[in-house]
Amino acid sequence: MTLDRDAASHVAEVLSEALPYIRRFVGKTLVIKYGGNAMESEELKTGFARDIVLMKAVGINPVVVHGGGPQIGDLLKRLSIESHFIDGMRVTDSATMDVVEMVLGGQVNKDIVNLINRHGGSAIGLTGKDAELIRARKLTVSRQTPEMTTPEIIDIGHVGEVVSVNTDLLNMLVKGDFIPVIAPIGVGANGESYNINADLVAGKVAEALKAEKLMLLTNIAGLMDKQGQVLTGLTTEQVNELIADGTIYGGMLPKIRCALDAVQGGVNSSHIIDGRVPNAVLLEIFTDSGVGTLITNRKPR
C-alpha cells in the first residue's frame, strides 16, 4: 500500500492537536442536543453517530438529547391532524401528544440508538417517562397587550417544562459504559405526558449532571454579530449585553437563553455549533478554533 505522506502528516497534526483536549475531558460528561439538518442528511447522521462512539472510546461521556419536529409534522400531516404553533411552540392536544410520543419515543429515538450501536457504541434509548427521568409540569403561556388589564392565559395543551431530572439513572448508565439517548418527553405528577422543547431538556439535563459542556447543534454557523460575523467566544455578561442591544433576537433567543441558563446553573460552557458541518461535535471539542460559539463564565477563546 502506497503511503500518502501529506495525508499521513495531516492525520498526525490532527491527533496532536486533539490530544490535550482528550486528556482534559476524560471522565467528563457532555450533553449534546441533536437536531436540525444534522438529523436529515444520511452522511451527517452517520458522522454524528461515529463522533459519539469516538468520544466514548476515548473516555468522554456523551449524553444525547434529540429533537424531531419535522418528523412529528410529517406524521401529523399524513394523519390529517392540523398543526398549530404559538410563540414557536406546537399546540399539543391529546391526539397530537400521541403522535409526539410515537415519533420521538419510537421512530426517532430508536433510529439514533440503532445508528450509534451499528458503529460500535452501546446506546440506550429513553424518554422522560422511563424511571421518571424527566419530571415535568404544564407550561403556562400568557400574552398581554397594552389594551389588556390582565394577561391572557393561553392553553397550549400537553406542552411542559422540566421540574427535575433523575440523575441517578443517567449516572448509572454512564458508569455502565452506556450512551443515553433521550427523547424530550416529560411525565407529570399524575402520569400525564408532556412535549418539551429539546433544547430546554438538554439544558436542564446538563445542569442536573453538572456537565462539562452543553452542545446545541443548529442550522447556523453560530451566534453572529450585526455584521454577520460569527462570535466564537463570549462570556455570559457579553451575551446579556447582546440580548439587551438587540443583536440576539427572535427565534434565536430561546436557544441562547437555554445555553446561558446552563452556564449560570453550573455547566462549564455552552456551545452553539453548526450541525451542517461534518464532524461538528469533534471539531468543537478537539480543535483550537471550533465550529461555533462558546459561552462561558471564563475568559473566552
UniProtKB/Swiss-Prot annotation:
One of its GO terms (biological process) is L-arginine biosynthetic process. The record marks 33, 255 as: Transition state stabilizer. GO terms for cellular component: cytoplasm. Substrate binds at residues 68-69, 90, 195. Keywords: Amino-acid biosynthesis, Arginine biosynthesis, ATP-binding, Cytoplasm, Kinase, Nucleotide-binding, Transferase. The keyword ATP-binding applies. CDD domains: AAK_NAGK-C. It is an enzyme of class 2 (transferase). It is found in: Cytoplasm. Transmembrane segments: none annotated. One of its GO terms (molecular function) is acetylglutamate kinase activity. It catalyses: N-acetyl-L-glutamate + ATP = N-acetyl-L-glutamyl 5-phosphate + ADP. Its main location: cytoplasm. Its EC number is 2.7.2.8. Pathway: Amino-acid biosynthesis; L-arginine biosynthesis; N(2)-acetyl-L-ornithine from L-glutamate: step 2/4. Catalyzes the ATP-dependent phosphorylation of N-acetyl-L-glutamate. Belongs to the acetylglutamate kinase family. ArgB subfamily. HAMAP family: ArgB. This is Acetylglutamate kinase. It comes from Pseudomonas putida (strain GB-1).
